[in-house]
């Protein structure tokens, strides 16, 4: 039947070679192949792009301007396509207000639950809060000092969009004269033109009163009118004081603490009704950190102990400090740590009213001659951060600030009213701070009254289902309050995956990009179960994946190859896992069948006998652990998801080393002491951040080979005849570049009802240089032709020039031979950017005392790429360096010299060292989940090596 298959004819996106592919519908399908072979081109740039385009094209032009328009992919036809949803690796959100709870929409159900069955408890005296009668309201007003002026208001519209014309007509009919709109008093006879797209608050002025003893009946009438019109709410707006909120619903009878109407937005930290007024719902506040301002307390003030005031381009602040210290009698030649507390306070927070005379003349002759109070370095940094209009200055000042938990809401983000409402004895903030596994237990064990249970039953079902989905994709260690911007790409993707499982859609084409990233093998089994559950709902799942377990669990595999870039783009094999394993020309098949495998190292390196030791590491879930990192070895940190690997390596070790070696101002996570840093000279963090943020940044510029290539072109006879220097061949400066596109090679065209379109420059046709520059050639190729070469092609082209060939060869060695030298950095994936950084390290002179840190470098890599990567890492270690990586991939784990396994579980159940030693030693530790999965792999590979034919 035609409708049980997706049939693709003539796919040519990027490097795809006009391929035809047939994919079964309603199955779990894995697309695999070498890095750069064309997997994503087939899955995302062909299938997803066309599925999305067809859906968007069915909508109106008005809707399309918001959804964006996708270009038709380069394909002849696709039949049997469903609406497509892409679940990729992009981080969820950089917004500090976005949390796991808001992204998964579980917060919406929590807010609804607390609003409907929550019980307000007074935070002052612990008394249950009950509704207020009119008599209680009148009593409260009469307790105010005599002659206090106030007005009684009835809030009839609160934070609602619209023009509200009917509301104003109703107020007129009721006979009221004044109304307060968005905080301003107006006469009801005025003409109101409210913006219908903005939220408005409208309150009727019921009465204006001066408090005196004989006014009870008037107050009674006013409150009754206010409550009748607003549905039970009234405001006493005290002139010159705080307004008093009244409600027929909830107020403390002892202290008068009022909660107001229990509605979902009261429990939202993104709404003014619920947000903490101090941190505005962020849970954190930026404060200047003394440890960042004075990073080395052994220095004197004269030696530059105050980091923000060290001279960069001006002597203004050093001179001001010098004159202030002379006149305030603070010694500048004493180490900061030995200064008296009073002197330290003066240096940090100012002279507390004492003035000093300051005389300063700048380089341009400008003179400042004043008597002033000494501001103090911390106050100075804080003021400059908040007052400056310069992004540069703000970024510089931000380096000396740290995020501290808000002391008003204690990090819960909500105001006192929201946090006073309890369900099961806990407020919503406390429950959101539980790990998802424990939160699920809380709701499973929740005991409610019979009436509350009837209301809460459907809400609880949704909450439990969504929490279960998150647990089943290996995220039980996360909390709903965790900021979305701190999630890894893999975590963000699995959160979206859990959200999609919860939607229970069927007939959808889901396209996923390596969902196994960041998952331990134990958690991966659960993930595969979740993928199968989505398939069984009647969906087609297309997963771009290299994980062997996922491939073996798939119904169908499509292997793209044989190589990467121009050497890829063909279907090497397609069929069930068993069929692909029998394919002779499929590299994936050879790894699945065991004909090809990554061998165990012949010996484990003993290292150089030195180590870096961290004691008392206690950041996040780390349990005061002491860890030794041996030097001169290939060290891998393992553990189940959420066990504390990233916290230990990235938050503690990396920041400690960066602070000591690079004078980095980023504050390390909690630890007691560190030793052994003198044994290394340089920290190199090879992460997945972009190598550049503009189209002009590319592999050639990043690796430094472009300088050598420009030198070469400047030495040609034609360049010498024309007087062209090296700068002529740069697209960053005027002269040789195309000025129509400023050397970008592309132009951005803004469209009204369509997304911005990028088109090749009509003058240089995307070549980035002007015609005169392109007339200079080396071996028949101009500079633009060279930038269009892949790294592999360029190695052959520049074979006679060792300086260039050596740098290019490192790109090939790390599996980036398919990348073009001029490929914009903005188009490189995180894994490609990471390997680009690795390549640039390989061609540098090795001191043998470098410390390399990599976080999951196997992201996006096929087994063949991983084999190559291990070879590159071995080269760095063989040169005497230390390589430390966080990794789950067992091929990498088995190749390590030394393992540090954290766990045993994720979240609160982790943070301890379960095992350390060689892979063989860890494999024998029964408590180690890593060891349990590693042991059979070691046994399998020993057996393979014993039967493998001699080379």
Model-derived regions, located:
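Conserved phosphate-binding elements of NTP-dependent enzyme cores
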Residues: 1-951
